[in-house]
Design a protein with these regions (language model features):
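Canonical helix-turn-helix DNA-binding module
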Residues: 55-82
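Beta-hairpin "wing" of winged helix-turn-helix
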Residues: 77-87, 91-94, 159-160, 219-220
Length: 246
């Protein structure tokens, strides 16, 4: 008996407006207006590393009072930019998701830089430009440098806005101690270097392992990271990267 040929069924798509539909096009201006306030912009930028911080620390970052920061945080939470977590009697705020961090980083790549007016600001800007975290992955000169070294060694390939892990890259990451590494990551445009660094699940996995190996160390500021002496040796041996001492 001859096998029967299966005829694909039609898929019906309703392109008529839904009854009672009230939502129109996206209001980009409303989202931009929330980020246009310098204090709220400072809060969002400080939280791009993915961690949760209390209002007291965010008030210091934004340079405003506790009562004022509460108003800003309420607006950002209401708009869906932030989520709040409770720890005992305290509240901690974090970005609602990686898409918020990506939006902040994308705007930062287009934004002018603040003029540096003090030694403290100069050191802060230098540290952020050298190495920082963005929602769990590395950014700055270190993040871009590691990404470009991996590309040069055939550990990853770039296809559009995606970095794909090669077989050689998977073997290398397993050698570093990452079992079953993610096979892809995003190409995130670095606002300070104007070149892409490795983001997404692959970037987060690699960054997390570098912290576990004590090659990286967090500073008192949440986003800034420094390379340890072990990290200098490890990055030189594995990727031929020479990292200047902090």
């Amino acid at each position: 008996m001859a096998p029967t040929t299966r005829i694909p069924t039609e898929t019906e798509i309703d392109v008529e407006p839904a009854p009672g539909e009230t939502a129109g096009d996206v209001d980009i201006a409303a989202a931009a207006a929330l980020m246009a306030d310098p204090s709220r912009a400072a809060v969002l930028a400080e939280l791009t590393d993915g961690r949760a911080l209390p209002p007291s620390e965010l008030a210091e970052v934004a340079g405003v009072s506790r009562s004022t920061i509460s108003e800003h945080l309420a607006k950002l939470q209401h708009a869906g930019f932030l989520t709040v977590e409770k720890g005992g009697r305290n509240r901690y705020f974090r970005l609602a998701g990686p898409e918020i961090a990506a939006a902040v980083e994308s705007l930062a790549a287009l934004a002018p830089r603040f003029p540096v007016r003090s030694l403290k600001q100069s050191r802060r800007a230098g540290a952020l430009g050298a190495a920082r975290t963005c929602y769990g992955h590395l950014a700055g000169r270190l993040g871009v440098g590691i990404t470009e070294a991996m590309l040069a060694r055939g550990l990853i390939d770039r296809e559009g806005e995606v970095f794909l892990l090669t077989d050689a890259g998977a073997t290398w990451l397993e050698h570093l101690g990452i079992a079953n590494p993610p096979r892809a990551g995003k190409a995130c445009n670095d606002w300070s270097e104007r070149r892409p660094h490795l983001a997404g699940r692959l970037g987060v996995a690699l960054t997390g392992r570098l912290f576990e190996l004590a090659w990286l160390q967090r500073t008192q500021r949440t986003r800034e990271v420094r390379v340890t002496p072990q990290g200098e040796v490890g990055l030189s041996h594995e990727l031929s990267l020479k990292v200047a001492p902090a």
